[in-house]
Amino acid sequence: MQPLVILTGPTAVGKTKLSIDLAKSINGEIISADSMQVYRHMDIGTAKITPEEMEGVTHYLVDEFEPDEEFNVVKFKDCAKEAIREIYSKGKVPIIVGGTGFYIQAVLKDIDFTENDSDTPYRKELEELAQTEGAIKLHDILKQCDPVAAEAIHPNNIKRTIRAIEYFKLTGEPISKHNEEQRGNESPYQYAYFVLNNDREILYENIDLRVDKMLDAGLVKEVLWLKEQGYDRSLVSMQGLGYKEIYAYLEGECSLEETVYLLKRDTRHFAKRQLTWFKREQDVIWLSKKDYNSDASILTEMVKILTEKEIIK
């Protein structure tokens, strides 16, 4: 089996710098598993890695799609597998880095999403329903047939909502049940799945600090520019953390003070959900920052584990 390294963890835990040091140490290249950093023009609110921070390490799936282009887990899996093949062809090690757990799982377990690309009459019916009665009505239908999928799929992601309803209609089985069964798949890779974590108080302090820095760096201007370019708040990209809150502020729905409070609160909730996801995953290696005196010592531990697992020589 071919090697694959995963480095994940909650937002603002400090994955970026460690991932660069890791890539340099093991002759690796990085595939971003971040559902937001894939979009161009959305830099500040996504805490996107800068070319300077990359330090010459090749990155995939950063700045590859426009904000109004569809990007989802199926597309991520296809793009990531293509990137993995390219990295292997160079004799290097692919490192998946990011906090979108479902994306990581899709590649690691080679999940079959049973995409049916041919249009069906039922799909057309659902698309018409979305146009006439709106995304929320469609999402309510999903809640009735598959509440677990409804929890995972944003109401504005109409295509995924339709696919989930359609899957239930065609098979009589919730797509969430199918995806859960796929979690038990054997991975086609020789892998190590690292989860970087920190004490909750420190993590939440880092989140608050990051939000303040984003605002100082011009997050409001960034969202205003996107709005002026015609990127509507109904887009999946514009529902990302930082963007939906600032968009609401620009629409006069809340004060800047309220917006900052909501953004910090929502980001903390997001970090909590990420950790819940990673705790459910199999074979993860937890790296708690409180157990190490520096990132260098964490890196040493990671390289040691990768050597023991014969992922690197």
From Swiss-Prot:
Annotated GO MF terms: ATP binding; tRNA dimethylallyltransferase activity
Binding site for substrate: 11-16
Residues of the site described as Interaction with substrate tRNA: 100, 123
Cross-referenced Pfam families: IPPT
Keyword tags: ATP-binding, Magnesium, Nucleotide-binding, Transferase, tRNA processing
GO biological process entries: tRNA modification
Binding partners and assembly: Monomer.
Family per similarity comment: Belongs to the IPP transferase family.
Function: Catalyzes the transfer of a dimethylallyl group onto the adenine at position 37 in tRNAs that read codons beginning with uridine, leading to the formation of N6-(dimethylallyl)adenosine (i(6)A).
Protein name: tRNA dimethylallyltransferase
Species assigned in the record: Lachnoclostridium phytofermentans (strain ATCC 700394 / DSM 18823 / ISDg)
